Amino acid sequence: MTVTPSETTDVDVIIIGAGFSGLGAAHRITERNPGTSYVVLERREQIGGTWDLFRYPGVRSDSSIFTLCFPWEPWTGPERVADGDHIREYLNATAHKYGIDQHIRFNTHVRSADWNSSDDTWTVTADQDGTEKTYRGRFLFFGSGYYNYDEGYTPDFPGLNEFDGSIVHPQHWPEDLDYQGKKIVVIGSGATAVTLIPALADSGAGHVTMLQRSPTYIGALPDVAITRFLRSSRLVVRPMLRIRYSRAY
């Protein structure tokens, strides 16, 4: 691919990634340091990071959404464990509400980041739609996560190439995959498997088998009615705790 060079864009802060970390950093920068300029470089076409990448059946948060979401933009949905679609909607709405989306450069693949001690600046080189983009800033924030977006981890099982069926990694779930009535084996019992397997079973899979190496504890999903009660109770409990704390100290 031919890359066309371009001029350098100077900002105070360069943020890599438009997922939870990148959006959170962008908000805190403007909240605590008004007037600070920044740019968010996102390789994908959408906001969300991992939550835009993972599209397998049943994808959802594997922890309480109240701890996953931003403290400055509380979650208002009824569920305590949110599905991937609602999380993406939340991230997009939040970025738009606070104007963060205006600072995001999509389809921008960072190729290098170099520190210059002579002027204390970072120079980031990226490809954006066939054009080389250069960004220079005093601070560089990596919100790029720890996944290999190009290829999910796949163990080298002997005989895998002799298997005649479909081999699918949840990280790159085909939109047109037809598993209706099929026998499916899921290797692993982590968060992905726990969310994937019930969704497969409920949406037409013939039989689903999970292969598990190490036993894990699994609890039932929180009930929506209980979640609403706890949320309303939290408004009462927290002030009481503050009063007791202030009186004790």
Language-model segments: what does each one mean?
Residues M1-P5, I29, G58, D101, ...:
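Short, flexible, glycine/charge-rich loop motifs used to bind or transfer phosphoryl groups or to couple energy/partner
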Residues E79-N148:
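Feature captures the FAD/FMN-dependent oxidoreductase FAD-binding
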